Design a protein with these regions (language model features):
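A flexible loop/linker signature enriched in serine peptidases of the S9 family
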Residues: 175, 294-308, 312-330, 348-355, ...
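Juxtacatalytic substrate-recognition/specificity segment
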Residues: 21-148, 154, 227, 352
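Blade/loop signatures of beta-propeller domains
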Residues: 248-267, 328-337
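Blade-terminus and WD-like Trp-Asp/Gly-His loop motifs, strongest in beta-propeller folds
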Residues: 282-290, 358-366, 406-414
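Beta-strand-rich domains and repeat architectures in extracellular enzymes and scaffolds
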Residues: 270-307
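Active-site-proximal alpha-helical
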Residues: 67, 153-175, 179-238
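Sec-dependent N-terminal signal peptides
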Residues: 4-13
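A short beta-strand motif characteristic of beta-propeller blades
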Residues: 267-274, 342-349, 392-398
Length: 421
């Protein structure tokens, strides 16, 4: 047991230092790092982003007392913040080792954050995690991860509270997703703790109050350890399982009530089905007989495929003639023939971060699209690619930029896109 405990603590400590590497598989030894010391933080950054680090340090000092008050903390140890722009990753993470790593300079930040700045939103979110870890920590003899394992705090609580205390409910966080899960009757199967965590935390606070959240997380048993399920039952009067069911009913009632006030899609116009069932983006060619799509060709596909589907009108006409002949013999009306498509894959990978996207040239000879790749110094980034339909040749148009959302001009002579160097 002593050997197992030692190995567990050592392994956990090593994992705490590999978060950024696990995202990209690269360590970036070419970077030179510096540190800014504030009253309560050590802010680490590499060359080229000092202004961003200074801004982040200021934000951190401003949000710290608010986060502590929200969680009922009187004291908080010194924390470490790491800023990097080396990879195009719209994310950040925090660890129980009291440090957070945040990727800055992100193209999709405006879509994700709405009317707030990426730095304020993501930094406040990750610092709330660190405050949370310090709120639920156990006695000295139960270090991480033993304390966390025993506490049994659900992932939705960890992520949901960070969103509840530092963010606003918005389309990408997670109104659009909730609507999809409600329509598909999969609200109870949401796997991302960020997703259901936000709405569950909003529901928890609305039903029981912010003070109850603090009481749940501050409660300790005789061994000075947090038992989340027992604490939840003690301070809310209901079991966690019942809370989850109440939340599910509440979400369904809210979103179906919202949907009942809107017109049906069929009332707006005729609905057409695309050739791919698992489709993320599409654009028709001008002749409307072809459509370019980004999606999955089969269930369980790990990446996405860029395909062009072409209608086989010859087969459709042939089948239509057969149906007409049969219908005439029986004196019936012939049934419509469903569109028949030939699908051809041209590329595969990731074609956008928040939104997969592509654009077909006005002359139908090429397609432009973003694709995730390794750039200079093996940095992860999106670049704009041009695909020739006939030649099948793929050309990288932005070798020195992080670029996304390409669109042809009406005459096809120019391309506009979002980018930074």
């Amino acid at each position: 047991m002593k050997y197992f405990t030692t190995v567990l603590i050592l392994a956990t400590s090593l994992l705490h230092g590999t978060g950024a590497w696990m995202m990209s598989g690269r360590t970036h030894p070419e970077l030179n790092w510096h540190t800014i010391e504030t009253d309560h933080f050590d802010v680490h950054y590499h060359e080229g982003i000092r202004d961003i680090a200074v801004q982040g340090a200021s934000i951190a000092e401003q949000v710290r007392p608010i986060l502590m008050e929200q969680m009922g903390l009187d004291t908080l140890r010194r924390l470490d913040i790491v800023f990097t722009t080396e990879d195009e990753v719209l994310n950040g993470f925090a660890m129980p080792s009291n440090h957070t790593v945040i990727w800055v300079d992100q193209n999709d930040a405006a879509l994700w954050a709405g009317d707030e700045k990426w730095m304020r939103t993501v930094l406040a979110h990750e610092l709330q995690h660190l405050v949370f870890f310090n709120t639920i920590k156990g006695p000295w003899w139960a270090p991480e991860p033993m304390n966390t394992i025993y506490a049994g705090v659900p992932g939705w609580v960890v992520e949901g509270l960070a969103e509840y205390y530092t963010e606003k409910w918005r389309p990408f966080r997670f109104d659009i997703s909730h609507k999809g899960h409600v329509i598909g009757n999969t609200v109870h199967k949401i796997q991302d703790p960020h997703n259901d965590g936000f709405s569950k935390s909003l529901y928890l606070a609305d039903r029981f109050g912010d003070s109850t959240i603090v009481k749940i997380l501050s409660d300790r048993n005789n061994a000075k350890l947090l038992d989340f399920k027992k604490s939840f039952k003690k301070h809310t009067g209901i079991k966690l399982k019942q809370f989850n069911e109440d939340w599910r009913r509440h979400m369904n009632t809210f979103f179906f009530g919202q949907r009942a006030q809107k017109e049906r899609v069929e009332d707006v116009g005729r609905v057409h089905k695309l050739p791919l069932k698992r489709m993320a983006a599409f654009d028709y060619f001008n002749d409307s007989l072809r459509v370019a799509m980004v999606g999955q060709l089969s269930r369980g596909q790990g990446d996405l495929s860029l395909v062009v589907a072409t209608r086989d009108t010859a087969k459709e006409n042939k089948e239509w003639k057969k149906r007409v002949e049969k219908a005439e013999k029986k004196g019936e009306k012939p049934k419509k023939v469903k569109p028949k498509w030939k699908i051809k894959e041209f590329d595969h990978g990731v074609f956008g971060e928040l939104i997969q996207n592509l654009d077909v040239a006005p002359d139908g000879q090429s397609i432009i699209y973003p694709k995730y790749r390794f750039g200079q110094n093996q940095s992860l980034q999106f670049g704009i690619w041009k695909l020739g339909i006939e030649s099948k040749k793929k050309t990288l148009l932005t070798p020195n930029m992080r670029a996304n959302y390409p669109q042809y001009s009406p005459d096809g002579s120019k391309i506009v896109f979002v980018a930074h160097e």
